[in-house]
Amino acid sequence: MENKSEMINATTIEFKTSSAEGSVDFVNVFDLEKMAQKVIPKGAFGYIASGAGDTFTLHENIRSFNHKLIPHGLKGVENPSTEITFIGDKLASPIILAPVAAHKLANEQGEIASAKGVKEFGTIYTTSSYSTTDLPEISQTLGDSPHWFQFYYSKDDGINRHIMDRLKAEGVKSIVLTVDATVGGNREVDKRNGFVFPVGMPIVQEYLPNGAGKTMDYVYKATKQALSPKDVEYIAQYSGLPVYVKGPQCAEDAFRALEAGASGIWVTNHGGRQLDGGPAAFDSLQEVAESVDRRVPIVFDSGVRRGQHVFKALASGADLVALGRPVIYGLAMGGSVGTRQVFEKINDELKMVMQLAGTQTIDDVKHFKLRHNPYDSSIPFSPKCFKIRLIFRRPNQILGQFF
């Protein structure tokens, strides 16, 4: 028998969130998060912003961007360009939208508003299986803008085939198979808040007919837990679409995905929402990128809050960098305009970093060498890290200091 808290009738749930649409005045996305907390209902904000367990991994995701950026001058750089062409799609930036469930938790217009904002910015929109808006409406809003879909795989192959048929009919270009969320993480904030989804999930209604009023644990139990490489093979074969495997955090899992026919690897730890105590996603990126060795594209998310974070991810092997929570905060505060502004803000920061680092193009960024932070205790000591720092004490005197 289902838990009583999982049986709440959707009609009994009172839910009122933001209906904002317009320009938002904010300095950075950390400020934007504080602003959004005031307009998103407590339970919904807790679901969006919190992480698993003690939130160690959630905070490590941001802290991990500890590599040093060495400025470079005299490089002839002016007005750096973030524009790229990714598998035939011209993008304003390698910054894309990560799949985030239930946009209507943050704004009444939900995925329609976020899709409009992403389209106006000019990048890839990734729809979540747990979207609160159906596929045709999102596709219509996006028009010819690139549209990806994040797939939570059902236990029923017939339902999976039907969803894939719909994806092809709606012009979705790639499938992102999530493999790191076969069960729900220990989200204690949701438990304290008694959070249940106040809105339905039309895309997966065949295997989750009553998404509204359900806990996250219930939602995850409706999906297939025993995912294997055979599922990757089947999705690629049946859909004929590129399949990005979302969740590898080590070389072994990346290799397993490639062996199964993955067209790309999406490095993430689900924003620290699943396994607390795991490594920061940025630390995992470097290992995975080295093992993949540019055989397929790499997408990265988790902890990205600054343009310099995007720069460092690209310099560490990512081809695309995805934003999640910050976009939802922009959606809450300004609808489609707020969504677009978040991308513009971080992209402007990226351009500034590119200028100061002496990189004219995104390809230049990918060849930029980061310097490890020698004071970071999380990086094991190596003779290669044993450097000499030059200290000027007075004119014409240089002293060598070891560290």
Curated annotation (Swiss-Prot):
Residues involved in pyruvate binding: Y47, Y152, R187, Y220, H270, R273
Annotated ranges, domain FMN hydroxy acid dehydrogenase: 21-375
First-tier enzyme category under EC: oxidoreductase
Keywords, alphabetical: Flavoprotein, FMN, Oxidoreductase
InterPro entries in UniProt: Aldolase_TIM, Alpha-hydoxy_acid_DH_FMN, FMN-dep_DH, FMN_HAD, L_lactate_ox
Protein's job: Catalyzes the oxidation of (S)-lactate (L-lactate) to pyruvate, with a reduction of O2 to H2O2. Is likely involved in the L-lactate aerobic metabolism of S.iniae that enables the bacterium to utilize L-lactate as an energy source for growth under aerobic conditions in the absence (or at low concentrations) of glucose.
Protein name as catalogued: L-lactate oxidase
Taxonomic placement: Bacteria, Bacillati, Bacillota, Bacilli, Lactobacillales
Record gene name: lctO
